[in-house]
Amino acid sequence: MHVFFEVDASVDKVMHVQEPYKLSNRAFHPEDSIIDVSGVKVGGDNLALIAGPCSVESYEQVLGIAKSVKAAGANMLRGGAFKPRTSPYSFQGLGLEGLDILCAVKEETGLPIVTELMSPDHLDVFNEKVDLIQIGARNMQNFDLLKQLGQLDRPILLKRGLNATYEEWIMSAEYIMAAGNENVILLRTRNPYF
């Protein structure tokens, strides 16, 4: 079969990929990826500065912070509407109410919003309202969720999982890309050695 493809006039070149990742491999996509997040370009020479509160607590809180971070140069607003917590007794976020607050602040400031998707139950509302869907470290290897994200028409911000290797992280991005969404941004938030 391989020989057939090499002599078929419709095939320019056959390349064997040895690495496990196919879609994110520079062998097939040598140019920098530029991802548009509601008018903000991410990648290449474009600097994206995402800032905001750890958790959304009120409209006034988020609006005040949004105005401050925008004045400081941020071009996207992040805030946790849903908060993954170790303790079931800790504040878990305002949920959909928090998402509505982020949307209202976006209307006021023009800043695209970034927030973490915790459950596949919220895929539709996130696809409708969130400019950049964040997948946190705990869900980096939730492969069913990653496949569903691949069917959305929204950029995805994929955080590196706790103790995940770079290969595992890139393979998680491949799950999203293989399902059809190539707008994946990798986010490494801290050095695990400190």
Listing of model-derived features with the role each one plays in the protein:
Residues 1-49:
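Non-catalytic terminal accessory/regulatory regions of metabolic enzymes
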Residues 2, 58-66, 121-129, 166-172:
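Catalytic cores of alpha/beta
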Residues 47-64, 88-93, 112-116, 137, ...:
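Active-site mouth loops of central-metabolism enzymes
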Residues 47-53, 75-79, 113-116, 131-135, ...:
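Hydrophobic faces of well-ordered beta-strands that scaffold small-molecule active sites
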Residues 64-80:
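Catalytic domains of carbohydrate-active enzymes, especially glycoside hydrolases
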Residues 78-96:
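Glycine-rich, proline-tolerant flexible connector loops at the mouths of alpha/beta enzymes
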Residues 81-85, 139-194:
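Conserved anion-binding
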Residues 91-115, 148-155:
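Alpha-helix-loop-beta-strand connector modules within alpha/beta enzyme cores
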